[in-house]
């Protein structure tokens, strides 16, 4: 059934690692609000959130992974999704699952020119269960692009409606529908 994650994962509460995109998901972003509701969750830290360099961001993600006591669920937004795809090809640390929200197209006109090294986007399957979530009016990446990434990565796919870039500007608050998708990803 389209929209329903089909991967199985281990039961029980696990760690989560928030992987923001450019700008580090500010105070009104659902990633930040989720993290505030779950004090045990952690966030990747990057040296420069406004001028991302993929090679540097890879090391930031890997350093955060090294500090965790168990395989986490990765909760990525925008450029964080591209980072997860690159990291999955570069590193071998275990991951429970990944929620990949609003995948941007690096060849699109809205992709930040300050971002370096995110192209080409890996087209190999991820080695962990994953779900790509897209919006039908995301200015940074079309549904068709997100669907292609999901197919390349072996990810399940959900089109979440007309909710922009699925960020604070979308007015989602703590995005309850996203939490439902995360819970379904982890339970199936």
Predicted regions located by residue number:
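Active-site catalytic motif of lipid deacylating hydrolases and related acyltransferases
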Residues: 6-70
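Active-site nucleophile loop of the alpha/beta-hydrolase fold
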Residues: 21, 46-49, 99-108, 135
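Gly/Ala-rich beta-loop-alpha elbow adjacent to hydrolase catalytic centers
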Residues: 74-85
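Conserved hydrolase catalytic core segment
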Residues: 86-97
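Short beta-strand/loop motif that positions the catalytic acidic residue
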Residues: 126, 131-134, 138
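Post-His helix in hydrolase/transferase enzymes
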Residues: 168-184
């Amino acid at each position: 059934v389209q929209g329903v994650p089909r991967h199985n994962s281990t039961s029980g509460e696990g760690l989560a690692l928030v992987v923001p995109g450019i700008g580090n998901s500010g105070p009104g972003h659902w990633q930040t609000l989720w993290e505030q509701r779950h004090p045990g969750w952690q966030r990747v830290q990057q040296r420069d959130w406004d001028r991302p360099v993929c090679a540097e961001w890879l090391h930031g993600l890997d350093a955060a992974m090294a500090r965790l006591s168990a395989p986490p669920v990765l909760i990525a937004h925008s450029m964080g999704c591209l980072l997860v795809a690159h990291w999955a090809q570069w590193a071998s640390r275990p991951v429970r699952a990944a929620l990949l929200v609003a995948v941007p197209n690096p060849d699109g006109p809205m992709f930040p020119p300050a971002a370096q090294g995110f192209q080409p986007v890996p087209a190999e399957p991820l080695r962990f269960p994953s779900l790509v979530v897209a919006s039908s009016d995301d200015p940074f990446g079309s549904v068709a692009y997100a669907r292609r990434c999901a197919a390349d990565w072996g990810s399940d796919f959900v089109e979440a409606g007309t909710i922009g870039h699925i960020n604070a500007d979308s007015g989602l608050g703590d995005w309850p529908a996203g939490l439902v998708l995360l819970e379904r990803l982890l339970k199936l």
